[in-house]
């Protein structure tokens, strides 16, 4: 399928996707019932969409195009109520978190969807292993060239986005010692990590043509980069965050990305170069492994900075943009999170350290999601 022309969007409009866990009490393992839930709610959703993701234990909640985080929060809140009621009617529960702490990938059923079945044929067991749960945020752009500039600008802050959303310390019944283990699942995919370097939309079109020669890439949706342009929506999509445990934190993360995008495209503070990515994977790893306690390294100077310090600096820089787009509440909440040192990955570990089981942890996550 050829790459579509870049659809012009209103700059800084917002779309958010949350991949949720469908679990089966009292054992709280992943259920294989997302299709049943989707059928139950499809005529009750008035804004946004509830749909499949890769496997039957995943349920995606997606907003419509929103002007700001308040509109997005309203849509999510309405969807949440409908989904929670449908889940209760079918003796299921819903929760966030980037990974389920003890599910076995071998049990996961790939959705009966042509695209997902084709992906299963291409990637085999890797697709079942990709039963992990992330938050994706789309930001509208006026042109393809703006999208490429924004993509490179946001890529500088991938460690910050990962660290602030880290919520996947447990996997396959084990403490991984990572704050966010979810991104590691995609390391075997040939398109893992950052998009190959291009400097404008014309070069991106050439890149996509080259990738399509592999026969594994039929559309932009087949590319799993950390951040990717979405020409059919006219957006840049940030894909590195774990699904948070609460709806409010998910909205705050979206506000952070929207405000950062506004700052980048209005101030144009960087002249992007290919060398910007020289230490990208090392800095990304620091965020995944240590969260906000990680350290990032400047590829030009070699200076090393604590992620906590650099995140506070970012929040300060984008505060005026956040005010202009109605996202100040998100930036203030994230600032409090960084200063307090609290994060969802550590809260999970604290629960287990206090004697809680992994089954009890999932139950707690369901209570948190339903109570937010």
From Swiss-Prot:
Annotated catalysed reactions: L-cysteine + L-glutamate + ATP = gamma-L-glutamyl-L-cysteine + ADP + phosphate + H(+)
Keywords: ATP-binding, Ligase, Nucleotide-binding
PANTHER family tied to this protein: GLUTAMATE--CYSTEINE LIGASE 2-RELATED
SUPFAM superfamilies the UniProt entry points to: Glutamine synthetase/guanido kinase
Protein name per UniProt: Putative glutamate--cysteine ligase 2
Pfam assignment, any one: GCS2
Organism listed in the record: Escherichia coli O157:H7
UniProt function note: ATP-dependent carboxylate-amine ligase which exhibits weak glutamate--cysteine ligase activity.
Family annotation (NCBIfam families): gshA_cyan_rel (TIGR02050), PRK13516.1 (NF010040)
BP-aspect Gene Ontology terms: modified amino acid biosynthetic process
Assembly and interaction partners: Homodimer.
Family listed: Belongs to the glutamate--cysteine ligase type 2 family. YbdK subfamily.
Enzyme Commission number(s) of this protein: 6.3.2.2
Keyword Protein biosynthesis (UniProt): no
GO molecular function, one term: glutamate-cysteine ligase activity
First-level EC class: ligase
């Amino acid at each position: 399928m050829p790459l579509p022309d870049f659809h012009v969007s209103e700059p800084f409009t917002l779309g958010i996707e949350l991949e949720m866990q469908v679990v089966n009490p009292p054992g709280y393992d992943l259920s294989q019932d997302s299709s049943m839930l989707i059928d139950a709610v499809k005529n009750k959703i008035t804004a946004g969409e509830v749909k499949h993701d890769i496997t039957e234990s995943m349920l995606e909640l997606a907003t419509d195009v929103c002007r700001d985080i308040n509109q997005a929060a309203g849509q999510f809140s309405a969807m949440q109520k409908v989904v929670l009621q449908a889940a209760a009617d079918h003796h299921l529960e819903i929760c966030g978190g980037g990974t389920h702490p003890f599910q076995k990938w071998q049990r996961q059923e790939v959705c009966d969807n042509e695209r997902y079945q084709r992906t299963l044929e291409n990637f085999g067991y890797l697709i079942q292993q990709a039963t992990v749960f992330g938050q994706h945020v789309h930001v509208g752009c006026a042109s393809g060239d703006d999208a490429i500039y924004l993509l490179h600008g946001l890529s500088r802050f991938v460690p910050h986005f990962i660290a602030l959303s880290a919520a996947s310390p447990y996997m396959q019944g084990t403490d991984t010692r990572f704050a966010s283990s979810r991104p590691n699942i995609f390391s075997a995919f040939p398109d893992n990590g950052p998009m190959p370097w291009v400097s404008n939309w014309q070069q991106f079109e050439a890149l996509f043509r080259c990738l399509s020669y592999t026969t594994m890439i039929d559309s932009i949706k087949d590319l799993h980069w950390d951040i990717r342009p979405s020409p059919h929506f006219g957006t840049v999509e940030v894909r590195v965050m774990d699904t948070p445990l609460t709806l409010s934190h998910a909205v705050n993360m979206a506000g952070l990305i929207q405000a950062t995008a506004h700052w980048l495209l209005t101030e144009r503070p960087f002249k992007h170069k290919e060398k910007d990515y020289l230490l990208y994977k090392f800095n990304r790893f620091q965020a995944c492994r240590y969260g906000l306690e990680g350290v990032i390294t400047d590829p030009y100077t070699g200076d090393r900075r604590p992620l906590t310090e650099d995140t506070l600096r970012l929040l300060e820089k984008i505060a005026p943009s956040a005010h202009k787009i109605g996202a100040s509440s998100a930036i203030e909440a994230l600032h409090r999170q960084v200063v307090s040192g609290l994060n969802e990955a550590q809260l999970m570990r604290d629960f287990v350290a206090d004697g809680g089981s992994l089954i009890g942890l999932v139950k707690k996550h369901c209570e948190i999601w339903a109570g937010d």
